Amino acid sequence: MNHNVLITGGAGFIGSHVVRLFVTNYPQYQIYNLDVLSYAGSLDNLTDLKNNENYTFIKGDICDNEFIKNIFKKYKISRVIHLAAESHVDRSIVDPFSFAQTNVMGTLNLLQVAKEYWQNNYVNKLFYHISTDEVYGSLGQDGLFSVNSKYDPHSPYAASKASSDHFVRSYKDTYDLPIIISNCSNNFGPNQFTEKLIPLVVNNIIHNKPIPVYGNGENIRDWIFVDDHVRAIDLIFHKGETGETYNIGGSNEMRNIDLINELITTTDSLLGRPEGTSIKLLKYVTDRPGHDFRYAIDSSKLNNQLGWKSSDNFIENIEKTVSWYIKQ
């Protein structure tokens, strides 16, 4: 079946990998990449696709109602994969209004335009909303976030994504819009903007700059390689059940300080430096306000229903990622 797929945020980190997979693997689809090209988005991530016949880039803002209406009408959009978002927690603490505008109002605008354009003819239509595990709040030493976990966001970023999730579900319950939501753990891999933990650490090691460690470095995150996340998005898009939520986790729990030490070891090695050279760059700083202690995802629903599983080669994927940043 042919689809005209609108992918929002397709010039960003995860979005660029999603766009590449869909353009490459589904030549029968027309892929429309909508991105405002903020500081974190770059068409350099997709230069190899610019001449593909089934790929079109559109520069624009998801909050612009008339603009989005024109896109749906001009390109006859039948499916949406919505990744466009402000996503950096520290920035959300400084400027929560921008996060509410993009993540909440932008999502609401897309939902409303999709509802109006599809006019209750929902056959083969889908609004697939990509979200985060941060909406669930924080875990203690034990347990996992499941699709039934209650929402308990602690940062303005998490609150904005939680609100957008609720709006997506409300359009299913109120208007019967065919929606799917997935919530994923922390991603890493090529193309990630350098404000995020892994590329920040690697770049600071490369340039001999201080490596900031929040608090005591004991906070725990569940890391997933971006290719694994994109494989899950592909499966959910094609085989997921509308109205459902799927959690996507990498099953790679690690304390921040342990991850940073691994990045130091790997980066120093790939740069030809003596082991432990960059340990001296560690700098413990005041903890982030509302810093969640631990995230960990239960992906069993996705595993059991759609046959997905994360890769087992975490260290190899870390090495791939570090190598990519060294070459930039």
Walk through the language-model features, giving the residues of each:
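N-terminal Rossmann-like NAD(P)+-binding domain of SDR-like oxidoreductases, especially those catalyzing
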Residues: M1-N187, D227, N256, K320-S323
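C-terminal substrate-binding subdomain of Rossmann-fold SDR/epimerase-dehydratase oxidoreductases
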Residues: V18, I31, G60, N109, ...
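Short acidic-hydrophobic sequence patches enriched in Asp/Glu that either
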Residues: S38, F193, L197, R255
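Residues at alpha-helix boundaries and the short loops/turns that link adjacent helices
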Residues: A40, N65, K74, E86, ...
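Short, well-ordered secondary-structure micro-motifs
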Residues: D44, G140, Q192, I224, ...
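Active-site loop immediately N-terminal to the catalytic Tyr-X3-Lys motif
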Residues: P96, D152, T194-E195, G240
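Proline-centered turn/helix-capping motifs that create local helix->coil transitions or kinks
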Residues: Q119-N120, Y128, G137-Q141, D176, ...
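A glycine/serine/threonine-rich, flexible loop-to-helix segment
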Residues: G143, T194-V202
